[in-house]
């Protein structure tokens, strides 16, 4: 008799995706982050659902409803902080996942990579709208500043901004629609994740060497299920430590002040995971130029498959490009630091140099290094 997991129409799909999936025998712990992102998404949807049961998306009651969740709802404080810090974990895993794709040349699976970029944009949009919901000072002013960027679009900009706001400023209509979008987007993300996995399983996983691994495959279960469980336990340990010991470590104190349209906070800064993009935005004096640089800072990832000049896929055997890669990582950390600093000397010039370096490494230096390495290794 055939095993039910191999014959049942639904279980068969799960079996081919998570159980009998042929996986390369040498994929390292950097490949754990895909499953960790799945866990983060499930956690965010679960905690978000319980928060939505008690939250009210009205400007007069939004702030106090969040306070009510933390004070009066059973374990409401835990759910709220798991959700807030879960977002930070989500982005840590996202950045490592993308970074791993860049390092090992996984972007050569173009469909999977492009789907991943769409997912990154969707998660960033969801996180931004979620940050507006508690209706604190930083929520309100963050929403005002970021949505206002769309007014830089020629001709239709102002109309577009007012259409998104549902009025002439960020108000009740804006909050209500942001809540609606914040609720629906994670489910759209789940659908996109399925497409992402569908594309991935068409080609199979990449591996650290960047070489074809068809001749050396092992079943996903039990080898990588056990390996993933270890990753999940470490992630949960880190998240729970953060939630129970320093839940406000990554937040902004300004968000504990109810939104006041008449009082601007001294420094408007987004959550830490957007600071690198915010620094790139601020480093260009022109409004439209800044917005374009902001979008391109993520969209530039879509160019990676077309900028790949080396005959070797992975950076494992390419020391010159490896060096550039780690300079890029340091540059992104610098941008993250600059994004949280006030707009004054020397931070302005550091931000501008770091922004130029970011685009230069990806668009110029890495493709050049690939050609140099091919020459040195006599790959042609």
Curated annotation (Swiss-Prot):
Heme 1 (or BL or b562) is low-potential and absorbs at about 562 nm, and heme 2 (or BH or b566) is high-potential and absorbs at about 566 nm. Belongs to the cytochrome b family. GO terms for cellular component: mitochondrial inner membrane; respiratory chain complex III. Component of the ubiquinol-cytochrome c reductase complex (complex III or cytochrome b-c1 complex) that is part of the mitochondrial respiratory chain. The b-c1 complex mediates electron transfer from ubiquinol to cytochrome c. Contributes to the generation of a proton gradient across the mitochondrial membrane that is then used for ATP synthesis. The keyword Repressor does not apply. Heme b b562 binds at residues 83, 182. Binds 2 heme b groups non-covalently. GO terms for molecular function: metal ion binding; ubiquinol-cytochrome-c reductase activity. It comes from Eliurus ellermani (Ellerman's tufted-tailed rat). The chain crosses the membrane at residues 33-53, 77-98, 113-133, 178-198, 226-246, 288-308, 320-340, 347-367. This is Cytochrome b. The cytochrome bc1 complex contains 11 subunits: 3 respiratory subunits (MT-CYB, CYC1 and UQCRFS1), 2 core proteins (UQCRC1 and UQCRC2) and 6 low-molecular weight proteins (UQCRH/QCR6, UQCRB/QCR7, UQCRQ/QCR8, UQCR10/QCR9, UQCR11/QCR10 and a cleavage product of UQCRFS1). This cytochrome bc1 complex then forms a dimer. Its cofactor is heme b. Heme b b566 binds at residues 97, 196. Keywords: Electron transport, Heme, Iron, Membrane, Metal-binding, Mitochondrion, Mitochondrion inner membrane, Respiratory chain, Transmembrane, Transmembrane helix, Transport, Ubiquinone. The lineage of its organism: Eukaryota, Metazoa, Chordata, Craniata, Vertebrata. It is found in: Mitochondrion inner membrane. One of its GO terms (biological process) is mitochondrial electron transport, ubiquinol to cytochrome c. A ubiquinone binds at residue 201. It is a multi-pass membrane protein.
């Amino acid at each position: 008799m055939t095993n039910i997991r191999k014959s049942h129409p639904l279980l068969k799909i799960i079996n081919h995706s998570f159980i009998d999936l042929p996986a390369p025998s040498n994929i390292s712990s950097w490949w754990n982050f895909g499953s960790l992102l799945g866990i983060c998404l499930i956690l965010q949807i679960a905690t978000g659902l319980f928060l939505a049961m008690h939250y009210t998306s009205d400007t007069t009651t939004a702030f106090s409803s969040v306070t009510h969740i933390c004070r009066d709802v059973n374990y409401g404080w835990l759910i709220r902080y798991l959700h807030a810090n879960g977002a930070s974990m989500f982005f840590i895993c996202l950045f490592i996942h993308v970074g791993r794709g860049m390092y090992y040349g996984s972007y050569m699976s173009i469909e999977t990579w492009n789907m991943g970029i769409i997912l990154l944009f969707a998660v960033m949009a969801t996180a931004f709208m979620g940050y507006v919901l508690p209706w604190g000072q930083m929520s309100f002013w963050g929403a005002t500043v970021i949505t206002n960027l769309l007014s830089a679009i020629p001709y239709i900009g102002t109309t577009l901004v007012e259409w998104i706001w549902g009025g002439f400023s960020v108000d009740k209509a804006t909050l209500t629609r942001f809540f609606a979008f914040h609720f629906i987007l994670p489910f759209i993300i789940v659908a996109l994740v399925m497409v992402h996995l569908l594309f991935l399983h068409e080609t199979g996983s990449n591996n650290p060497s960047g070489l074809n691994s068809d001749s050396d495959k092992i079943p996903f279960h039990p080898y990588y299920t056990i390996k993933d469980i270890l990753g999940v336990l470490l992630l949960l340990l880190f998240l729970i430590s953060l939630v129970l010991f320093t839940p406000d470590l990554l937040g902004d104190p300004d968000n504990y002040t109810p939104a006041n349209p008449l009082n601007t906070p001294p420094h408007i800064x987004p959550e830490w995971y957007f600071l690198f993009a915010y620094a790139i935005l601020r480093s260009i004096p022109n409004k439209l130029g800044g917005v374009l640089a902001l979008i391109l800072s993520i969209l530039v990832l879509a160019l990676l498959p077309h900028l790949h000049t080396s005959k070797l896929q992975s950076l494992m055997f390419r020391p010159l490009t490896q060096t550039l890669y780690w300079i890029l990582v340091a540059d992104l950390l610098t941008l993250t630091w600059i994004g949280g600093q006030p707009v004054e000397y020397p931070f302005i010039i550091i931000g501008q140099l770091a922004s130029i370096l970011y685009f230069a490494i990806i668009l110029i230096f890495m493709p050049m290094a690939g050609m140099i390495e091919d020459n040195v290794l006599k790959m042609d």
